[in-house]
Amino acid sequence: MVYMDLNSDVGESFGRWTLGDDTAMFQSVSSANVACGFHAGDPTVIRRTCREAVQAGVMIGAHVGYRDLSGFGRRFVDIDPSELADDIVYQIGALQALAATEGARVRYVKPHGGLYNAIVSHTAQARAVVDAVKSIDASLPILGLPGSEVLRLAEAAGLRAVSEAFADRAYNPDGTLVSRSLPGAVLHDPAQVAEHVLRMAADSAIRTVDGSILRINADSICVHGDSPGAVAMAVAVRAALSDAGIDIRAFA
């Protein structure tokens, strides 16, 4: 049977501030990118998120990012690569400990926001991420954009590189994501998102902002949990894939 992994960013609440409906998202996705406290999340939120993921049978991954709570980790940070590597190790270690208290373990790593976008082409930061992951557990896959520098370096280092696509994001013709600062960068219509995902999963292709078709091979598809209507989009995506005979299953 053909299958696809659906992942979502979760655990991004902080203290009395709540973001997204993680409990509802867990009913549709197979993998959870859990914030590790640097761009969002706190120890209580992280542990609760791990508990709910375990209860829902959803795989846990470390959603690591820049140390940038006020910017939600979406801004580029010009950080020394060795310091970035230490920050990544710190975040993965924190999630590993909190996941263990709920009888779970971290199964993969996905960089977040500004860091995710930077390491598409920023070799020094991409290498810092790869070195950090390898120093902790060389069996941890790294999730990233197809053709990115971080996935190239991960493969070269003997790590598993997992390509992902985004259900609710618009693409440039070169395969990069349209900047969130531009109109139309984030898709909000569940039907449009479902069609977008079906093209990715069934045809290994996406329609870019200029109307051209780009070939893309993705092992996982991300549905952002903090977008307006995120739960409805996740439900629509899962239903569309199921109707097309595509099973939803974690990639690891």
UniProtKB/Swiss-Prot annotation:
GO terms, molecular function: 5-oxoprolinase (ATP-hydrolyzing) activity; ATP binding
Class of this enzyme: hydrolase
A Pfam family it matches: LamB_YcsF
InterPro entries: Glyco_hydro/deAcase_b/a-brl (IPR011330), LamB/YcsF/PxpA-like (IPR005501)
E.C. code: 3.5.2.9
Catalysed transformations (reactions): 5-oxo-L-proline + ATP + 2 H2O = L-glutamate + ADP + phosphate + H(+)
Subunit structure: Forms a complex composed of PxpA, PxpB and PxpC.
The protein, known as: 5-oxoprolinase subunit A
Naturally occurring in which organism (per UniProt): Arthrobacter sp. (strain FB24)
Lineage: Bacteria, Bacillati, Actinomycetota, Actinomycetes, Micrococcales
